Structure formats: C-alpha cells, structure tokens
C-alpha cells in the first residue's frame, strides 16, 4: 500500500462520524487550523448551539500563525463570519487537549454556565482523541464531535504541507493509547488495520510527533 493509502486509514479512524444535533455549547479546540473557527461559525449560523467557547493559548507550531493566541484569532475569525461577540467566550490559557476541557469547564463554572451537552469542534484527525479526553475529564458532558467535511487530499491542500499533516496523523494515532495508558483519556478500540497502517508509516519515517513510550 502507498503512504497515502495508509494515511487514509488513519484519517478515517480518527473521525467519529457523529450525526450533528443541537447542543448547549460548542467547544472549538485551538490548533494551527483556522478551519476549526470557520466550521464552528457555520454550525452556529445553522442554530446548532447558542454559545461558543474557543480554547487555546499557543503551541510551538501556532505561535507564528496566531501570535495573540489560538482562541483570540479563532474568535476574531468567527466574528468576521457573522457570529456576535456576545456568543463567544475565549479560554486563552490551554496548552493541550486536556486543558482545553478542564480550563473551559472552570471558566464556564465561574460564569455560572453549566452545560449538559457540547459539540467538540476540532481538526478532523483530532476528533477521536478529543472525544476520549473529554470522556475522561468531563464524563457527565454529553458530547458529539464535528469537523469541517474534507477529504484527506483537500485537507492537505488547505494546510499546504503534506509531511506535516502525515506526521500529525501518526502522532495523534499513537496518542490514542499512550494517553489512555497515562489516565488522560478513555481507552479506544484500535483495529488491526489501523495499527498496521501506523507501523508502516512509522517505518517510512513519519515519526516527528511520536512520544516516548
């Protein structure tokens, strides 16, 4: 199989394929991908939720593109697309997916907001990890995952860096079991074809995002 065949297997695995429905809030997870903010705005305009929390400070990969922080730039983009500022809450301190949820929860509690359901909006290949992390850290929250509908080829074209996307895919796959083993996320079934594709991509050198195990 080609590297793109293997990447497609990982890409399909990470997406939860949840049916969209109305929820109390949206949580837009910060990253290098402004498409998260744009998709969140699309769903808001469809009436899927009345309140958006954009969560994220900076990672080393986002400082240049979002110098004032991921949440700030996401909020500005959503406003440009017609979301009123009164519907946007910014959580500007999270530096990882776990903090996206713990700090968002704490912020909402301080504001007297107690959601029972949420739409988690992320990069397409972050869906499963975000879902597992939220299940572990905020188990009473009823969540669905959503991302801008894109093929892998279209997503790579939108980011403009194939190797970066493929390295992120491999790294996020490994994090499914590493974070579960560390207690940061719930365990997720990893099918054999996903493990085989992951190992083949590692063998092809896509290891820049691999964690020590």
Residue ranges, per PLM feature:
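A conserved mid-domain beta-alpha-beta active-site/ligand-binding segment of alpha/beta enzyme cores
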Residues: 159-213
């Amino acid at each position: 199989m080609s590297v793109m065949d293997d990447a497609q297997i990982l890409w399909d695995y990470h997406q939860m394929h949840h049916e969209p429905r109305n929820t109390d809030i949206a949580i837009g997870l910060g990253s290098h991908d402004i498409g998260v903010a744009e998709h969140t705005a699309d769903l808001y305009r469809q009436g899927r939720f009345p309140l958006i929390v954009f969560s994220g400070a900076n990672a080393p990969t986002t400082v240049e593109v979002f110098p004032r922080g991921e949440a700030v730039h996401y909020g500005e983009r959503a406003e440009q697309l017609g979301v009123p500022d009164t519907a946007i809450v910014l959580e500007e301190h999270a530096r990882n997916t776990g903090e996206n949820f713990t700090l968002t929860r704490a912020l909402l509690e301080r504001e007297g907001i107690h959601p029972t359901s949420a739409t988690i909006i992320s990069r397409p290949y972050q869906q499963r990890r975000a879902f597992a992390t939220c299940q572990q850290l905020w188990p009473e929250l009823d969540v669905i995952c959503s991302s801008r509908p894109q093929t892998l080829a279209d997503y790579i074209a939108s980011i403009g860096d194939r190797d970066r996307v493929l390295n992120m895919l491999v790294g996020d796959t490994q994090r499914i079991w590493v974070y579960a083993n560390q207690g940061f996320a719930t365990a997720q079934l990893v099918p054999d074809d996903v493990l085989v594709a992951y190992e083949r991509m590692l063998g092809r050198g896509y290891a820049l995002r691999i964690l020590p195990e």
